C-alpha cells in the first residue's frame, strides 16, 4: 500500500520577501501535497505557482489605539482563525509553514489549536513583532540571519539562511540576459525589491549622468508605481518596472543600489554583488537598517540613510567605487562569504524533521 503524501499548508503573503522563500521551499518538497494560504488581491495571486491551490483569508494589521477600525480588524482575525482551523481539519494537513507577516497569526493559532507543528521562517536580522510574539508558540523558528537569535530568547530557533528563487541556484550562465549591454562596460543595477522605491529612483536619475560619462550602463528597475517613469532618456540607461532574470542581471552587475529587504540582500550574496544600500526608512521598526548593518559589518556593502543621502553624495560614492575595481571585487567576495546558497535545502530538511517526527 502506497502511503499518502504529507499535506503541508504554506502561509505566505504580500511581498516578494515573504513569497519567494516560501516558493523556493515548496520546490524542494516535491513529494508533499502543498496548499497555499494567502490574502485576496495580493502578490501571491500572481506569483504562487498554479500547482499549489490558493486559499485566501481576510486579514490585516492592527493600527495604534483601540477604535472601531481595530475592533473590525479583530473580528476579521477571529473569523480568519476559524476559517484556517476548518481548512486544516477538513484537509487533514500535517503541518504549517509561514514566512511571517499578518497572515502568520491566524495560521499559527489555528495550527497550534489542533496540535499541528508549525515552522516559522524569519528572514530579517530583527525579527518582526509577529515573529517575536508567535515564535515561542512554534515548533521552530528558522532564521535568515544568525544575529536574530538574540531577539527570540523564548523560541527554539536555528539559522538556515533565506531561500532564493531557483534561477539563483544555476549561476554561471549569463546568456539569458537579453538586454542591450556591451560585454566590457561597468553595469549598475538599481532596484527596490518587489515594491520599488520612488525616493531612490529620484536620486538615481539625478546622479546617473555622471555615471554615463564614466562609461557605465544603468539598469533601473523602478517598480510599477513610479510617477517619473520615462523622465530620463539616455542610450546607456535601461528602465524597466521589473526584470524576470534577476540572477543573470545581478551576476553581470558591477554594483547594485538597493533597499535592504532580506530577500534582495540574499540574492545579492548568492551572486556576490557589491552594493550601496539605502534602507527603507518607513519599514516596521526600521528593520531594513538591521539587515544592512549585517552587510556593512561584513564589508559587503556601503549603507546610507535615505535622509542623509543626496544625489551628489550618491553620484560620488558610485564613481569612487567604479574607479576602485579592487575594492568592488573585495566587497563582492565578502558578499559571497555570507551567502547560504543551499538555504532552501536546509529549510526543507528542517520541515521534514519537524513534520515527520
Curated annotation (Swiss-Prot):
Cellular component aspect of the GO annotation? plasma membrane
Biological processes, Gene Ontology terms: carbohydrate metabolic process; cell division; cell wall organization; lipid glycosylation; peptidoglycan biosynthetic process; regulation of cell shape
Tree of life domain: Bacteria
Could you say which EC number(s) this protein's record lists?
2.4.1.227
Q: Which InterPro entries match?
A: GlcNAc_MurG, Glyco_trans_28_C, GlycoTrans_28_N
Q: In which pathway does it act?
A: Cell wall biogenesis; peptidoglycan biosynthesis
Q: Which GO terms describe its molecular function?
A: UDP-N-acetyl-D-glucosamine:N-acetylmuramoyl-L-alanyl-D-glutamyl-meso-2,6-diaminopimelyl-D-alanyl-D-alanine-diphosphoundecaprenol 4-beta-N-acetylglucosaminlytransferase activity; undecaprenyldiphospho-muramoylpentapeptide beta-N-acetylglucosaminyltransferase activity
Per UniProt, where does UDP-N-acetyl-alpha-D-glucosamine bind? 15-17, 124, 165, 194, 288
Q: Keywords in alphabetical order, please.
A: Cell cycle, Cell division, Cell inner membrane, Cell membrane, Cell shape, Cell wall biogenesis/degradation, Glycosyltransferase, Membrane, Peptidoglycan synthesis, Transferase
Enzyme superclass (EC)? transferase
Any idea where this protein resides?
A: Cell inner membrane
- Reported function: Cell wall formation. Catalyzes the transfer of a GlcNAc subunit on undecaprenyl-pyrophosphoryl-MurNAc-pentapeptide (lipid intermediate I) to form undecaprenyl-pyrophosphoryl-MurNAc-(pentapeptide)GlcNAc (lipid intermediate II).
**NCBIfam families for this protein:** murG
Q: What is the protein's given name?
A: UDP-N-acetylglucosamine--N-acetylmuramyl-(pentapeptide) pyrophosphoryl-undecaprenol N-acetylglucosamine transferase
Amino acid at each position: 500500500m502506497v502511503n499518502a503524501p504529507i499535506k503541508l499548508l504554506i502561509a505566505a503573503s504580500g511581498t516578494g520577501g515573504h513569497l519567494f522563500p516560501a516558493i523556493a521551499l515548496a520546490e524542494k518538497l516535491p513529494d508533499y501535497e502543498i496548499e497555499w494560504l494567502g490574502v485576496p488581491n495580493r502578490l501571491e495571486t500572481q506569483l504562487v505557482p498554479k500547482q499549489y491551490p490558493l486559499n485566501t483569508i481576510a486579514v490585516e494589521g492592527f493600527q495604534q489605539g483601540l477604535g472601531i477600525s481595530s475592533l473590525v480588524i479583530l473580528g476579521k482575525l477571529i473569523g480568519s482563525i476559524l476559517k484556517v482551523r476548518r481548512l486544516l481539519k477538513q484537509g487533514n494537513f500535517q503541518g504549517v509553514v509561514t514566512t511571517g507577516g499578518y497572515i502568520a497569526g491566524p495560521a499559527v493559532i489555528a495550527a497550534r489549536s489542533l496540535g499541528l507543528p508549525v515552522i516559522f521562517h524569519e528572514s530579517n536580522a530583527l525579527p518582526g513583532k509577529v515573529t517575536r510574539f508567535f515564535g515561542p508558540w512554534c515548533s521552530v523558528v528558522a532564521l535568515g540571519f544568525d544575529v536574530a537569535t538574540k531577539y527570540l530568547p523564548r523560541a527554539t530557533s536555528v539559522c538556515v539562511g533565506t531561500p532564493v528563487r531557483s534561477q539563483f541556484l544555476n549561476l554561471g550562465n549569463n546568456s539569458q540576459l537579453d538586454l542591450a549591454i556591451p560585454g566590457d562596460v561597468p553595469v549598475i543595477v538599481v532596484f527596490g525589491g518587489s515594491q520599488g522605491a520612488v525616493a531612490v529612483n529620484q536620486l538615481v536619475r539625478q546622479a546617473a549622468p555622471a555615471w554615463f560619462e564614466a562609461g557605465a550602463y544603468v539598469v533601473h528597475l523602478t517598480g510599477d508605481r513610479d510617477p517619473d517613469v520615462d523622465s530620463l532618456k539616455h542610450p546607456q540607461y535601461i528602465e524597466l518596472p521589473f526584470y524576470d532574470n534577476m540572477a543573470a542581471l545581478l551576476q553581470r552587475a558591477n554594483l547594485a543600489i538597493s533597499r535592504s529587504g532580506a530577500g534582495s540582500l540574499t540574492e545579492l550574496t548568492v551572486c556576490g554583488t557589491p552594493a550601496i544600500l539605502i534602507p527603507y526608512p518607513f519599514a516596521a521598526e526600521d528593520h531594513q537598517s538591521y539587515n544592512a548593518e549585517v552587510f556593512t559589518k561584513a564589508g559587503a556593502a556601503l549603507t546610507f540613510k535615505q535622509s542623509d543621502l543626496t544625489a551628489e553624495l550618491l553620484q560620488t560614492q558610485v564613481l569612487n567605487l567604479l574607479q576602485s575595481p579592487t575594492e568592488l571585487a573585495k566587497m563582492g567576495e565578502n558578499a559571497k562569504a555570507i551567502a547560504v546558497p543551499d538555504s532552501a535545502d536546509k529549510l526543507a530538511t528542517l520541515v521534514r524533521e519537524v513534520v515527520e517526527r
